[in-house]
Amino acid sequence: MTTTAPHVPVLIDEVIAGLEPATGETHVDGTFGAGGYTRALLQAGARVYAFDRDPDAIAEGRALEDGQDGRLILVPERFSRMAEALNERGIDQVDGVTLDIGVSSMQLDRADRGFSFQADGPLDMRMEKSGMSAADFVNTADEAEIADVLHDLGEEPRARRVARAIVQARPITRTSELAEVVRRALGHKPHEKKDPATRTFQAIRIHLNAELDELEQGLAAAERVLRPGGRLAVVSFHSIEDRIVKRFLRDRSGATPAGSRHLPDARAGGPRPSFEAVAKPVRAGEAELARNPRSRSATLRVARRTAAAPWGTAPKKEGRQG
């Protein structure tokens, strides 16, 4: 385990301002991680259902339960299952949902989890510690599949060159080995701010953990569990993720100019808007960047749930709240 500075939640003040949590409300933190957003919600007096697919995050979060008078409920599930998991606990509607997309600081900071190219560790990258590891993928996938993953999920412009270098360097079992293979393939000048391995590690991680599918399903789940007037706050770090969030909120708010055969037009009898924008997208200012360098690429989007039924479902009856 590496020694790191204390975890600082990204755009925490802006997230809490967007959610407006209050005493007695029920909120979902869909990505508990090191618990930064959950702590802020608890301090505001809310009850929090904190989800995380990573068993390490849940285990370490147990200490935070003490002294909360039952207001913190840790849920060892993917956030895409929030509707089902809440229903199993007698909750149909909540006042707010927070999602901080991607790898957590806790996962990045631990070399033994294999997420970071900045520290040597086993090439793993699995959030749930099950299924295919990053080492399995880079050592068994063919060159074309690796190139497709790097291009589609990492937006790596020289994906084929990197994929070829990975195949030629097999076997690769350590994060430092993979990072060096990519750097040699692309060239790396010490003064460059962005490490050439960034896109490759991002792409493989997203692929192994099916993160984009999880995000799409999680947004739809948030739509189902939020009460009318409830708020959704999503922090994303990559353009691919932000496009998914932007498209979801644009479509659900009725901001799409016109319908198509894929997306019905609300003005022509399609579903009524289920969200409305609260504010423009928020990005980190100078003070935030100085305090928390990880916020450099972060984008926060906040929306308010309307009284319309979730898209693709019958109108929702009055539900139970925690």
Swiss-Prot record:
UniProt cross-references to InterPro entries, sorted A to Z: RsmH (IPR002903), SAM-dep_MeTrfase_MraW_recog (IPR023397), SAM-dependent_MTases_sf (IPR029063)
Chain positions covered by the region annotation Disordered: 254-322
Entry keyword S-adenosyl-L-methionine: yes
Gene3D superfamilies: Putative methyltransferase TM0872, insert domain, Vaccinia Virus protein VP39
Residues reported to bind S-adenosyl-L-methionine: G35, G36, Y37, D52, F79, D100, Q107
HAMAP family: 16SrRNA_methyltr_H
Identification of the protein by name: Ribosomal RNA small subunit methyltransferase H
